[in-house]
Regions:
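Class I SAM-dependent methyltransferase SAM/SAH-binding core
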Residues: 97, 106-153
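A short acidic, Gly/Pro-enriched loop at the edge of an enzyme's catalytic core
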Residues: 155-164
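Conserved Class I S-adenosyl-L-methionine
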Residues: 242-311
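Conserved class I S-adenosyl-L-methionine
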Residues: 93-102
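Conserved alpha-helix/loop element of class I SAM-dependent methyltransferases that forms part
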Residues: 74-92
Length: 311
């Protein structure tokens, strides 16, 4: 299923970032007229001319959890994750690998719901450390262990996992084929792989919205088309069962989460530097939304089986 490109917003509302700046009073408190063409963040910063006390910075991971839930740092709450992994048919006898563990929220939710042993791997050292600390505090250090890894060099124990989940786990990996081969080797015979992944639509690859999003990412994206993923998985021995465009759902989750946070969190009462952290985060997500909206960036769900000979 496809959405097409460059559609106007269906709800007719003004852009989310513009509404956020309005909430913060950016347009009415400016002490200095912003230069023409200044970015929304620059305009907001100019508007905060009054002096503010020095307050410890607001952690980006705190903002992420306001958006997505405790222990969650990307679109998709606990209910979404549990629905996503339904095809796995998880049980206490099974083992699962999460390649985008973040702070470990998804791994812990899955472990608690199904009794499955989940290994969570996270590219950020700090997030992995904090995620494991939370698992320990919740007595889930064994069933939802979180550790750091480098996806460019990771190795897995052969035939070690029944299922592997990756949400945005490969789009910034340079050696994608190598990583997918490692995943194939790490799965048991008829083991299951589920990817929710960013891809590029070659017809819109030169769009400036895509370039702007790429420039803001922590790990530079090296995007494949969905056909490249399909061809690579087949060549490695995977049997692909589902390829579904879930871009519209992903966009909707982003907008809904920001709408909710603007309602539930008293941003106006925050210190200036905390407001700026939220606006910076909003601008990052607006770049992602723009790349999705113009059709250059797509999100696909891919479900495949490791078609290995029986041992």
């Amino acid at each position: 299923m496809t959405d097409g490109a460059a559609k106007p917003q269906a709800d007719g509302k003004q852009p989310l970032l513009a509404r956020m700046l309005s909430w913060l009073g950016a347009s009415s408190t400016s002490a200095q007229t912003p230069a023409p063409g200044a970015s929304p963040v620059a305009r907001a910063r100019r508007s905060e001319a009054d002096a503010a006390p020095v307050i410890a910075p607001l952690d980006r991971m705190t903002v992420a959890q306001w958006l997505w839930g405790d222990g969650f740092i990307m679109p998709g709450d606990a209910n979404y994750v549990l629905e996503l992994v339904k095809p796995f048919g998880l049980s206490p006898a099974m083992s699962m690998l999460d390649l985008s563990a973040g702070l470990g929220g998804p791994a812990r939710v899955i472990a608690q719901a199904f009794g499955t042993y989940v290994t969570g791997l996270e590219r950020s050292v700090e997030r992995a450390k904090r995620g494991m600390e939370i698992s320990v505090a919740q007595n889930l250090s064994k069933r939802a262990a979180i550790g750091h890894y480098n996806p460019e060099t990771v190795e897995l124990r052969p035939n070690g996992f029944d299922c592997i989940l990756g949400r945005g786990a490969t789009y910034s990996v340079v050696e994608k084929e190598r990583l997918l081969r490692v995943l194939f080797q790490g799965l048991k015979q008829r083991g299951q792989l589920l990817l929710n992944e960013f891809t590029v639509d070659p017809a819109h690859a030169e769009r400036p919205e895509l370039a702007a999003w790429i420039a803001r990412e922590t790990y530079p994206p090296v995007l494949w088309t969905i056909n490249q993923y399909s061809d690579c998985l087949t060549s490695l021995g995977f049997e692909t069962r589902v390829v579904e465009d879930v871009t519209a759902q992903y966009r909707s989750m982003i907008v809904t989460a920001w709408e909710r946070m603007l309602t539930e969190v008293d941003i106006k009462a925050m210190a200036r530097n905390h407001k700026m952290t939220i606006i910076d985060e909003a601008e990052r997500w607006m770049h992602r939304l723009a790349a999705l909206q113009c059709g250059a960036l797509r999100v696909f769900r891919v479900y495949a089986l490791a078609n290995k000979p029986a041992r």
